[in-house]
């Protein structure tokens, strides 16, 4: 599933092609995604101008002058591309938003776990209203994590992936951040010290910022808007490397399932 760096990479690739463009039309080839695409999308978007494209957590928000925004989530396998308007649709190309410049924003989603919604006020939508702070914002600190974790018995990795705690940190970047901070993913969240949470918050910020710089992590389902690969995959320290040698100490990386998610860590480096 695309995580924050992949969604941010998508945003940065799309925004220059979308902002200021007038929407010519909308084609819904298959509206039954994770949630049905509202018919009002076809009615409200044509004729509207895109005023901004932004990100909240793993959601892309396409603001318009039609009094609302299109809310997009890539789900497990979704991708967005800006293509010449005469590009024939392929399998799983479910939505086209055609633009005045003759190009088309195309949403492809083989597994159909993504979504396209319409919302008058994005901040009040039930999917967005209860989200935690952005990890790259000043609000996300080790002191914040330590205070929120007090008394929690869940594994720290599960805690870090809770979108009400902090948004956009999924399985890949939680594993990598915990490794950099030297914290075992198995440790109870409420038993991690303030100082170690400060290291963890710094690690999350550093790894996410670097992953964005590298274009995200190209795994099975992520495609950036220009089709270029994300190069952070080449630098993963633990994720997906169970049984291999730790790149820091040389010890064998361990594997377990935590919160129904595959987890890899180094028992020597992470305590």
Curated annotation (Swiss-Prot):
Catalytic activity field: Hydrolysis of DNA containing ring-opened 7-methylguanine residues, releasing 2,6-diamino-4-hydroxy-5-(N-methyl)formamidopyrimidine; 2'-deoxyribonucleotide-(2'-deoxyribose 5'-phosphate)-2'-deoxyribonucleotide-DNA = a 3'-end 2'-deoxyribonucleotide-(2,3-dehydro-2,3-deoxyribose 5'-phosphate)-DNA + a 5'-end 5'-phospho-2'-deoxyribonucleoside-DNA + H(+)
FPG-type zinc-finger residues: 237-271
GO molecular function: 8-oxo-7,8-dihydroguanine DNA N-glycosylase activity; class I DNA-(apurinic or apyrimidinic site) endonuclease activity; damaged DNA binding; DNA-(apurinic or apyrimidinic site) endonuclease activity; zinc ion binding
Top-level taxon of the source organism: Bacteria
Family matches, as SMART domains: Fapy_DNA_glyco, H2TH
UniProt keyword annotations, A-Z: DNA damage, DNA repair, DNA-binding, Glycosidase, Hydrolase, Lyase, Metal-binding, Multifunctional enzyme, Zinc, Zinc-finger
Secretion signal, residue range per the UniProt entry: none
Binding, DNA: 92, 111, 152
GO biological process, one term: base-excision repair
Enzyme Commission code(s) on record: 3.2.2.23, 4.2.99.18
Cofactor: Zn(2+)
Textual note on the cofactor: Binds 1 zinc ion per subunit.
Pfam families hit by this protein: Fapy_DNA_glyco, H2TH, zf-FPG_IleRS
Active site annotation, chain numbering: 2-3, 58, 261
Subunit structure: Monomer.
Similarity comment: family membership: Belongs to the FPG family.
Function: Involved in base excision repair of DNA damaged by oxidation or by mutagenic agents. Acts as a DNA glycosylase that recognizes and removes damaged bases. Has a preference for oxidized purines, such as 7,8-dihydro-8-oxoguanine (8-oxoG). Has AP (apurinic/apyrimidinic) lyase activity and introduces nicks in the DNA strand. Cleaves the DNA backbone by beta-delta elimination to generate a single-strand break at the site of the removed base with both 3'- and 5'-phosphates.
Protein name: Formamidopyrimidine-DNA glycosylase
Native organism taxonomy: Bacteria, Pseudomonadati, Pseudomonadota, Gammaproteobacteria, Lysobacterales
Gene designation per UniProt: mutM
